[in-house]
A protein has these predicted regions:
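Short sequence/structural segments immediately N-terminal
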Residues: 1-199
C-alpha cells in the first residue's frame, strides 16, 4: 500500500512540476525580451515603438499582445504558435542573414503574410483582446464593418500595415481559397479596370 501511495505522490509531484514548467516556459517565451533576443526581431520592435499602438492610453503592447493568443482558453493556440510557427522562425534566424534591416526587408513580405494569415485564422482574436465593442466612426466605417460581418472578414482583412513597415496588402479570403498569397486589389484600380473592360 505504501509503495502505491509513494508512486501516486511522486507521480503527482512530477505532474505538477511538468505543468508548472509548461506554463512557466510559455510565459517566458511570450515576453518581448525573449522575442527581441533574436537579432532580426529588433527591427519590428523598433517599428512598434514608433506606431500609433505604442503609448496610446498608456499602453505599450509587447510582441505577444498581437502575435500570441492570450488567456487560459487560448493556451493551446499559444503553445501551437510557439512550437509550430516559432521553431521554423528560429531555424530561419540561424540560416538567414538578417544583419541589416535591408536584408531583413527582403523577407518581410513573407513574414507579414504569415502573420496576417494567423490573425485571419484566429478571427483577429488578439486585436479583439484590446479593441472590445468597436464602434466604427462615421458612415463609411460603419458600412465597412457591416460588410465585414456579412462577408466573413475580420479586423486584419482591412487593417493591415498598422504597426510595422508597410508591405503590399493581401486579400486574405482569396489567399485562403487559393492556398497562396494573393495581393489585395485597390478598390479604385478595380473599378477602373471594370470600366475599361466595358469599352
Amino acid at each position: 500500500m505504501s509503495g502505491k501511495a509513494g508512486t501516486f505522490i511522486i507521480g503527482g509531484v512530477v505532474g505538477i512540476l511538468g505543468i508548472a514548467m509548461v506554463f512557466g516556459g510559455e510565459a517566458a517565451v511570450s515576453q518581448t525580451e525573449f522575442c527581441i533576443s533574436c537579432h532580426s526581431e529588433i527591427y519590428p520592435y523598433e517599428e512598434l515603438k514608433k506606431s500609433s499602438h505604442w503609448g496610446a492610453l498608456g499602453a505599450d503592447p509587447g510582441c505577444k499582445d498581437c502575435h500570441v493568443p492570450q488567456g487560459f482558453k487560448n493556451f493551446h493556440k499559444a503553445i501551437y504558435t510557439h512550437v509550430v510557427d516559432g521553431v521554423p522562425f528560429l531555424i530561419k534566424e540561424f540560416t538567414t542573414d538578417y544583419s541589416t534591416v535591408e536584408k531583413f526587408n527582403e523577407h518581410r513580405p513573407e513574414a507579414a503574410f504569415r502573420a496576417r494569415m494567423k490573425l485571419k485564422e484566429w478571427d483577429s482574436l488578439t486585436c479583439r483582446a484590446c479593441h472590445k465593442n468597436v464602434k466604427a466612426p462615421g458612415a463609411s466605417a460603419k458600412a465597412a464593418h457591416a460588410k465585414m460581418q456579412s462577408e466573413g472578414a475580420t479586423c486584419i482583412d482591412c487593417h493591415q500595415n498598422l504597426v510595422h513597415k508597410k508591405v503590399p496588402e493581401h486579400d486574405l479570403n482569396a489567399s485562403l481559397a487559393q492556398g497562396k498569397p494573393v495581393a489585395k486589389v485597390e478598390k479604385k484600380k478595380k473599378d477602373d479596370d471594370e470600366e475599361g473592360s466595358k469599352d
